[in-house]
Amino acid sequence: MYRDHTKVIQIGDRKIGGGNPILIQSMTNTKTEDVEQTVAQILALEQAGCDIIRCAVPTMEAAKALKEIKKQIHIPLVADIHFDYRLAIAAMENGADKIRINPGNIGSTERIKAVVDVAKERGIPIRVGVNSGSLEKELVEKYHGVTAEGLVESALDKVHIIEDLGYDNLVISIKYSDVLMCAKAHELIAEKTNYPLHVGITEAGTLYSGNIKSAIGLGIILNQGIGDTIRVSLTGAPLEEIKSAKRILKTLGLRKGGIEVVSCPTCGRTQIDLIGLANKVETMVQDIPLDIKVAVMGCVVNGPGEAKEADIGIAGGVGVGLLIKHGEIIKKVPEDQLLDTLREELLNWK
């Protein structure tokens, strides 16, 4: 698999590449200059399972704020830089564990060298990021539009700029909102380089459409063994990105931990408020540290059979439900006690 052979990169106290676990990233949507709000959001993201956090650094005040933010958080901090090379330098001087730049908009080779020199001195990795919106005009013309081949050529051109300055502590990201083209770009670049890849579908959309596009895109890419860190980019609360990323990794067998809830679709045999019950179960289990499968079924006719592959499950009936464990019916429970009974079983799980 590609990710087993990618270069190992140290980001703060975490390692990516070389077969290390795929890490989940998100990005704050607070003003980085507002240390209190930014720290509060990062701590909440940490609690949800975020492994690496990125903050926008559009001003010198934001760059300087990183120093205080870094003191109060427990995961690696990435500074997102555009246009001004001095912000990249200031971010590193104030504790950034990694910087994200597009060498194409940083400026002259001298300015890029100034950034690379500080990164080299401090051992800070640089994420070289390109996306469809920043693709050079000559590459658009060469490939007759925005293409996977053009994105890959652009990314490698920028990598070569930094390599020529004697630095290879790099991560690459290629972002595009077109799922299939983004997948193709990752397939192409994974064949051409062994740098770790940060994977995501950019501008994926709202919670509904963004989750669908991200699940499909990341699923295609990750299932080929490509990708060392991921972000589910959503127009929504950053916490939702973490929930989705964890579920995608777990579904692909790339991360353990957390209860998986499965539930049947509603039909004419449903004898209980299955939609409400399934949602309550999913919310209830979020903070229970088990790695098991829980089934929520809508009737006592097919429920027990359909729940056999789950570790534990409940099936609703008329005023009464069943508690099922490892495919066996354990007991009947009054309908209004189903949720509490399931919770008690989970809290005492052995």
Region roles according to the model:
Residues 1-27, 120, 283:
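N-terminal amphipathic alpha-helix/helix-capping segment at the start of soluble metabolic enzymes
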Residues 19-37, 56, 75-83, 139-152, ...:
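Active-site mouth loops of central-metabolism enzymes
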Residues 22-28, 53-55, 77-81, 99-101, ...:
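Hydrophobic faces of well-ordered beta-strands that scaffold small-molecule active sites
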Residues 29, 34-35, 46-69, 100-108, ...:
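Glycine-rich, proline-tolerant flexible connector loops at the mouths of alpha/beta enzymes
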Residues 60-81, 114-126, 188-197, 281-283:
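Alpha-helix-loop-beta-strand connector modules within alpha/beta enzyme cores
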Residues 72-75, 92-99, 120-123, 190-196, ...:
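Glycine-enriched alpha-helix->loop->beta-strand junction motifs that scaffold or abut catalytic
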Residues 86-127:
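Hydrophobic or amphipathic alpha-helical targeting/insertion segments
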Residues 131, 139-285:
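Catalytic alpha/beta core domains of metabolic enzymes, predominantly
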